[in-house]
Curated annotation (Swiss-Prot):
Catalytic activity: L-alanine = D-alanine
CC terms in the record's Gene Ontology section: cytosol
Name this polypeptide is given: Alanine racemase
Family: Belongs to the alanine racemase family.
């Protein structure tokens, strides 16, 4: 009887990548494994996918270092770039690809390149890790997300300066959709047009704008590289499941019934007595709570799966437990498995009941949850 287990199917993960390849057959795949591979496990995900993809994308330098230190020698892109001088030097020494999204990053790169030219044979550089250069730069253009990226009219200036920098090997272009999960969205079409115009004279260079939603719904924007993220894990980037497209859920979150109780009509349940049964019933207590990362704000009626049937959460989720209404005729027993989400209870359904996105559910599981890889 094990509480709070996240079972990760490597087979499902590989299956989903093969499906993505069919959706983008001519493109290279940069698998996004940021945020602990969307909560699925950074290093297990990298090991499972290494022979199927053309590189990995991460958001933090330490993620790139962890993957490379396993012996992986392929492309690793820092999708937010380097945050300071120390990170830039480490990026150079390890040969990571990096995004440039602002003037400050460009100026720091130019400054380090100038120092290298002057001091490359002196002790200044002998005190650093050996530099492997040049590195590949991905110039990020803000086409409408308005989060990171240079303005489209700055592309020529940034390109010229990067082209003249001795620490730059190749220059690619990327952007990010803000509403790609909305089908037939004029704003997304506008972003594509902006990206096209900004990179028109650089069409010989690699380009990328399509992440998960772009892969699914905007094939005209696949360009040379696509960046699958949450869909690798069989999860939709919105509330509509993608299992009908052939994707398989990678994670099953499960736990155990640790108590079964007869409950009288009119009696409250849980902290604050927020739920009161209108009839006699049987309650089950599940070893899963917000201490495991299950949302405390999950409302009454949020579904869980026990013995092949959906039952609702009742009362407030507590730190270590939650309570479900098994029904008066329940035949369930202590020790029975409880599925919080997985193949037969999709995470999109749970997320919609709670009023969050699936991304939050999978990335907020705590270290108390046991991860098993199969």
């Amino acid at each position: 009887m094990k509480p709070a287990i996240a079972t990760i199917s490597r087979q499902a993960l590989r299956h989903n990548i093969q499906l993505i390849k069919k959706l983008a057959p001519k493109q290279k795949l940069l698998a996004m494994i940021k945020a602990n591979a969307y909560g699925q496990g950074l290093l297990p995900a990298a090991a499972t996918l290494a022979d199927l993809v053309d590189g990995f994308g991460v958001a933090r330098l330490h993620e790139a270092l962890e993957v490379q230190e396993t012996g992986y020698t392929g492309k690793i892109l820092l999708v937010e770039g380097f945050f300071d001088r120390e990170e830039l030097l480490k990026t150079l020494s390890r040969g990571f690809d990096t995004v440039i999204h602002c003037l400050e990053q460009l100026e720091l790169l130019e400054q380090v390149a100038k120092e290298w030219q002057i001091e490359q044979q002196k002790r200044f550089w002998q005190r650093k890790t050996k530099i492997y250069f040049p590195i590949n730069i991905w110039l990020k253009i803000d086409t409408g997300m308005h989060r990171l990226g240079i303005h489209p009219e700055q592309v020529d200036l940034f390109y010229a300066r990067l082209k003249s920098c001795p620490l730059v090997a190749t220059i690619s272009f990327m952007s990010h959709f803000s509403r790609a999960d909305e089908l037939d969205c004029g704003y997304t079409e506008q972003q594509i047009a902006t990206f096209e115009m900004a990179t028109e004279q650089y069409s010989a260079h690699s380009r990328s704008i399509a992440a998960s939603s772009g892969i699914l719904y905007w094939p005209q924007a696949h360009y040379e590289w696509v960046r699958p993220g949450i869909i690798m894990h069989g999860i939709s980037p919105h509330y509509q499941p993608i299992t009908q497209l052939g994707f398989k859920p990678v994670m099953t979150l499960s736990s155990t019934l640790i108590a079964i109780r007869s409950h009288k009509a009119g009696e409250p349940v849980g902290y604050g007595g927020a739920w009161i049964s209108d009839k006699a019933t049987t309650l089950g207590v599940v070893a899963m709570g917000y201490g495991d990362g299950y949302p405390r704000n999950a409302p009454e009626g949020t579904p869980v799966l026990i013995n092949g049937r959906i039952v609702p959460i009742v009362g407030r989720v507590s730190m270590d437990m939650l309570t479900v209404d098994l029904g008066i005729d329940s035949q369930d027993q202590v020790g029975d498995e409880v599925i919080l989400w997985g193949n037969d209870l999709l995470i999109e359904t749970v997320a919609q009941h709670i009023g969050v996105i699936s991304y939050e559910l999978i990335t907020k599981l705590t270290p108390r949850v046991i991860f098993e890889y199969r």
